[in-house]
Regions:
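Class I SAM-dependent transferase core
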Residues: 1-26, 32, 62-76
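Conserved SAM-binding strand-loop segment of SAM-dependent methyltransferases
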Residues: 75-85
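Conserved SAM-binding motif I beta-strand of class I
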Residues: 53-58
Length: 196
C-alpha cells in the first residue's frame, strides 16, 4: 500500500504524468484508461489536460463510485464506465486516440485487450515495470494486433521506486470484429510466438 505523502506523489501522480514522455496529449481528442483503479493515470492526465475527453474504465464498482467525485466537481469531458474492457470492444472498436493501462496484466493479454479500441494512427501506451522480458513477450501480440512499437522509454522514478518502461505502440490497421477473441481464449492462449 502506498500511504506516505511523498510516495503518493511519486508513485501515483508523478508516475501517471510520465506517460507524457512519449506522447503529446494536446494533439489528442480522447483517451481511455482501463483498469483505472483510483484514477491513475487517467484522472491525473485529465487534470493536466482539461480539454482531453477521458474515459476511466474499471470492472470494480467501488473504484468507479470513488471516482464519481470528479463528476460532482463538474469535470467536463469525463466518462466513468463500470465494466470489463473486453465488453467495450464492440461498441468502441477503433475509437480512441490513446488507450493506456497501468499495472493491469501481462503484455500479451494487455495488448490484445487494448489494441482493438485504438483508432488507426492512434496509440496504445503500456505503463510497465522493469521486466523487459515481459515487454519482449508482448511484441508478437503487438504485431498480430496491427501495431508497431515506436518507442520504449526506460527510466527510474527514484532509487526506491525502481525502473519503469513506457511502451508506445502505434496502430497501423483497423481491427475487424472477426479478430476479437473471447476473454477466456485471450487468457488461456495469449498471443505469443509459442502459441501460434
Amino acid at each position: 500500500r502506498i500511504v506516505e505523502k511523498e510516495d503518493v506523489y511519486l508513485k501515483h501522480f508523478y508516475d501517471s504524468l510520465t506517460l507524457t514522455k512519449v506522447i503529446d496529449l494536446k494533439t489528442c481528442t480522447n483517451l481511455l484508461d482501463f483498469g483505472t483503479g483510483a484514477g491513475f493515470p487517467g484522472m491525473v492526465l485529465k487534470i493536466f489536460f482539461p480539454d482531453l475527453k477521458v474515459t476511466l474504465l474499471d470492472s470494480n464498482n467501488k473504484k468507479i463510485k470513488f471516482l464519481t467525485i470528479l463528476q460532482e466537481m463538474n469535470v467536463d469531458n469525463l466518462e466513468l464506465i463500470n465494466t470489463r474492457v473486453e465488453n467495450l470492444r464492440n461498441e468502441r472498436l477503433n475509437y480512441y486516440d490513446v488507450v493506456t493501462a497501468r499495472a493491469v496484466t501481462n503484455m500479451p493479454v494487455l495488448t490484445e485487450l487494448a489494441m482493438p479500441l485504438v483508432k488507426i494512427n492512434g496509440y496504445f501506451i503500456a505503463m510497465k515495470g522493469s521486466n523487459e522480458e515481459e515487454i519482449e513477450d508482448g511484441k508478437f501480440a503487438i504485431i498480430k494486433m496491427h501495431g508497431i512499437v515506436e518507442e520504449i522509454n526506460k527510466f527510474s522514478l527514484s532509487k526506491e521506486a525502481g525502473m519503469r518502461n513506457i511502451v508506445k505502440v502505434k496502430k497501423e490497421k483497423e481491427t475487424l470484429n472477426t479478430e476479437l477473441r473471447p476473454y477466456e481464449k485471450i487468457i488461456k492462449k495469449p498471443l505469443q510466438k509459442f502459441n501460434k
